[in-house]
């Protein structure tokens, strides 16, 4: 159901006995900024807030910043609020500029472009083709539909160009998964629902899958997988592999095995600490301690099955 007029400060999820506030995505920021810029260009009036509908069915009332406009273009920004999610893009400004296009553009068509701080795709396996801006399919649709609706409301029979950019996006991107995914020069404009759910396990496992998919579509039949730093340090320091040789799966070993099957990989090699991997011997495919432990019990059981003495066990 749609929650009309609700503010993100009023939306929470409870995880691990904590009350965590939801946020909204860079895609939602891009849509809101584009809508506001279109309103200012078409109406020649400053806009302070816009109401947008997210794919999740939640309406947001977002503040518009850095506004300026002329008769030919309008520029503004929306500040990303990630809620209580530990997101390095929290607080960034996502800018949009809407300009009237020249005669070579079909009337009423929205041309979406990317500028500074928005990454470019350099490898196969992602939603966009090599060389294209890293603006995913859902945000592209959100931005285009929002601007097309304002064109229609204003009765304007001209095409427009929409430019999205993020100051400091290139620097921020170094702290994200983008370098490992083959996205260079900036962050991605993301979000299938338009909403950020704090501490989302699905968001993490989806990112792991995308990283494996990129490797598979760029010719990799086998993949190294590590839960964390123990495994990656061993591959780098002891075996001499590059630091990004392996996919980090955190505690989601079962999911990464499923991903490998889904992608028709020939095999994966798990590299990590015995304290993690001994759990796999008991079929524990999520290795987080809150899911299950039993490490000593697993050792004892397998020692018994191997014929170990009572004293040993």
What is the meaning of each model-derived region?
Residues 9-14, 21, 27, 181-187, ...:
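A structural signal for small-residue-enriched, beta-sheet-centric alpha/beta enzyme cores
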Residues 8-181:
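Generic N-terminal targeting/processing segments that precede catalytic cores or assembly contacts
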Residues 1-7:
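N-terminal amphipathic/basic-hydrophobic helices that include classical n-h-c signal peptides
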């Amino acid at each position: 159901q749609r929650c009309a007029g609700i503010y993100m400060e009023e939306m929470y999820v409870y995880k691990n006995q904590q009350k965590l506030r939801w946020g909204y995505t860079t895609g939602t920021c891009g849509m809101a900024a584009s809508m506001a810029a279109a309103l200012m260009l078409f109406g020649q009036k400053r806009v302070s807030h816009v109401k947008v509908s997210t794919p999740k069915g939640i309406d947001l009332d977002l503040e518009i910043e850095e506004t300026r406009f002329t008769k030919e273009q309008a520029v503004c920004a929306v500040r990303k609020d990630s809620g209580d999610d530990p997101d390095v893009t929290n607080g960034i400004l996502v800018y949009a500029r809407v300009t009237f296009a020249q005669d070579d553009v079909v009337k009423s068509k929205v041309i979406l472009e990317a500028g500074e701080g928005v990454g470019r795709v350099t490898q196969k396996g992602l939603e966009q083709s090599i060389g294209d801006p890293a603006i995913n399919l859902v945000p592209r649709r959100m931005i285009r539909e929002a601007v097309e609706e304002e064109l229609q409301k204003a009765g304007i029979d001209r095409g427009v160009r929409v430019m999205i950019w993020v100051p400091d996006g290139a620097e921020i991107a170094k702290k994200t998964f983008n370098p490992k995914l083959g996205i260079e020069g900036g962050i991605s404009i993301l979000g299938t629902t338009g909403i950020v759910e704090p501490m989302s396990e699905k968001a993490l496992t989806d990112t792991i899958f995308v990283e494996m998919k990129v490797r598979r579509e760029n010719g990799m039949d086998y993949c190294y997988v590590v839960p964390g730093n123990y495994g990656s340090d061993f591959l780098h320091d002891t075996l001499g592999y590059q630091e990004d040789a392996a996919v980090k799966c955190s505690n989601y070993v079962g999911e990464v095995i499923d991903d490998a099957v889904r992608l028709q990989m020939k095999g994966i090699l798990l590299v990590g600490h015995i304290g993690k991997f001994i759990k796999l011997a008991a079929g524990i495919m999520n290795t987080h301690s809150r899911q299950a432990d039993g490490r000593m019990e697993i050792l004892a059981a397998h020692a018994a099955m191997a014929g170990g003495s009572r004293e040993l066990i």
